[in-house]
From Swiss-Prot:
Residues the record lists as binding Cu cation A: H699, C734, C738, H742
Gene3D superfamilies on file: 1.10.287.90, Cupredoxins - blue copper proteins (2.60.40.420), Cytochrome c oxidase-like, subunit I domain (1.20.210.10)
Superkingdom of source: Eukaryota
Protein name according to UniProt: Cytochrome c oxidase subunit 1+2
Record note on cofactor: Binds 2 heme A groups non-covalently per subunit. Binds a copper B center.
CDD domains, per the entry: CcO_II_C (cd13912), Cyt_c_Oxidase_I (cd01663)
Source organism per UniProt: Dictyostelium discoideum
Amino acid sequence: MKILEIYDKQIAEKEGNIFIFISKWIISVDHKNIGTMYTNFSILAGIVGTLLSLVIRMELSTGNMLDGDGQQYNVIVTAHGLIMIFFVVMPAMLGGFANWFIPIMVGSPDVAFPRLNNISLWLIIVSFFLLLTSSCVGIGVGTGWTVYPPLSTMEYHPGHAVDVGILSLHIAGASSLLGAINFLTTVFNMKIAGLSWSKVSLFVWSILITAVLLVLSLPVLAGGLTMLITDRNFETTFFDPIGGGDPILYQHLFWFFGHPEVYILILPGFGLVSIILSKYSNKGIFGVKGMISAMSAIGFLGFLVWAHHMYTVGLDVDTRAYFTAATMIIAIPTGIKIFSWLATLWGGVIKITTPMLFVIGFLVLFTIGGLTGVVLANGGLDISLHDTYYVVAHFHYVLSMGAIFAIFAGYYYYYSIMNSTRLFGVVRYNEQLGRIHFWTMFIGVNVTFFPMHFLGLAGMPRRIGDYPDAYIGWNLIASYGSLITAFGLLFFVVNIFTPYIRRSVNIKNGAIILMGLDFARDWQIGFQDPATPIMEGIIDLHNYIFFYLIVVAVFIGWVMGRILWRFSYKWSYPTIGDIEIFKNFTAYNQIIHGTVIEIVWTLIPTVILYLIAIPSFTLLYAMDEIINPTVTIKIIGHQWYWSYEYGDNASNLIEFDSYMVYERDLAEGQLRLLEVDNAMVVPVKTHIRLIITSGDVLHSWAIPSFGIKVDAVPGRLNQIGLYVKREGTFYGQCSELCGVDHGFMPIKVQAVKLGEYFSKLNEK
């Protein structure tokens, strides 16, 4: 004991020594210290990103917080997206947990390149501050996290803000690439002798596959960003149609990285979930080889589906059909993982702790996000839902609730290991605070993001800081949900610091009062009323797909509820009947390791996807047909307005512009952000060809009731057929980032009889 007391005294003295502090933290090459610094950095960045998200939700709840400054809103949205992806999830997963536990799990004393590990950490920190700087330089980076040209070119984003942002992403990419190379080398070259690949932890496998994805995808992003920065500063024209370039090339390069990036964010979470699930169900993971194969398949297929983010840019229908099929196939290995986790729970003795609660929350919410992903995979349905809040809801269920819940589960699970020291002793989180954190956050994120599905179905475009009054109800509810989520995160912050300050925390009862909401108009929980056969087909296909997805969701929910009811420690106990199957060795082997049951639940999603695919392809090819058009209308997108060109019955070319009517000029009964000075006119029950292009940046011509959403791309002529079945006035909006501080670009279409159509043209 005397030796330990002397050691503790020396440790206490060293903690106050600045040189020892620098040696331990600033220039440390110890993988544990670096992992701790990564984790603390991701918590700090997460606080910044969460505060930005609260600003977004407050703006969307009032519309006046930023005084109508669309560029400032887009700068905040861009910073929020980039921070949460590159500086929260990736540092926590790959920098924090991977650095801490990969060497331990493979029996290595440290990572292969400790100094490379240190520089990787400091590169990501430098990158983070560069990103924050880019938001404050000039007009900021208001391009969205995708940084699409032409909006990101010097013409539309002058100054150095975008250049600094690109430099930040380059440095962050270099940091991730160095880390990936380090982990690959560590696992392959430093794995302890006798540890077979089949016995390597699923977390190690997940990091290994993630590292491969990083090595293969990041150079493509770096190439695209380098081409963009040379377009901005050195007069190259990689993405400028005037010089023979194509802005769609950038989208291909970006999404070839961007979609594997989704799996880079979520795969380490799969590994953490597997570890925690096995621990607190007191069982080995069901079908380990199947789980490894599923993760490998997800990683491989992730490189083959990037263009499902680009269904509206004018891709050939056969190309869209391929990406639809390839994207839906990813649901099969993902389904295998969900079913394998459920099989792990079945028959175990489940202990409900804070990490286990977050894992169960992960399973529920990730499943919902995956099911909506099957909807968006359809090239036909996505035409209506692309760039709406349905997409926002989908990827937040996968990332904000999937990856983030996995991070919280892992942090609570490894909290004592990662934070205990000789100075502070063994530190433990407060279980009650952890549970309060889970339930408030679980409720908060669902209240925030679930209503966004309804906003998307009704056609609310994303990336816009204000919106027609019809959408105010669900936006208010989502904003209340964000406050509940932030309130829950306070319990997390208190919980992780309480063990150090060693003070008791008294939790007082409180209440949140929700004001009565007055829902405007009738755009609430479904699509707008269809006006074309295409929109009717979209609604029918959506309902058809949802029938199968709801069946799957109900089945998974029933199984999970049954498991928690029958096998939870202290809730109930397994009965003799529950464990009867384990008396039979063959049956036991099938439940624990067998392939027969895996084949069965591989076939289940395969059959469901096949049943979904047939009507999906039918609708997709029907949408591509343009049947003997008698009217052709050319639509040109500009910043602030739309231009329309079409001929009358005497073949005279008629041109006019369509600007939004500002709120101060609206007549009584007119709709804010939807009225225009010159409405587009189309004849009913007539086949029409629409030719859509852009005169400056990317735009999106979208009418929810028509089931039409087509990108207007500079240098390209995208066309689509239109057949309006009924008379009426129909509204839409541009759903792309259409310029720096651009005005809203509403679309108003009047569908009239053919005779009245020509009369209105003559008036114009």
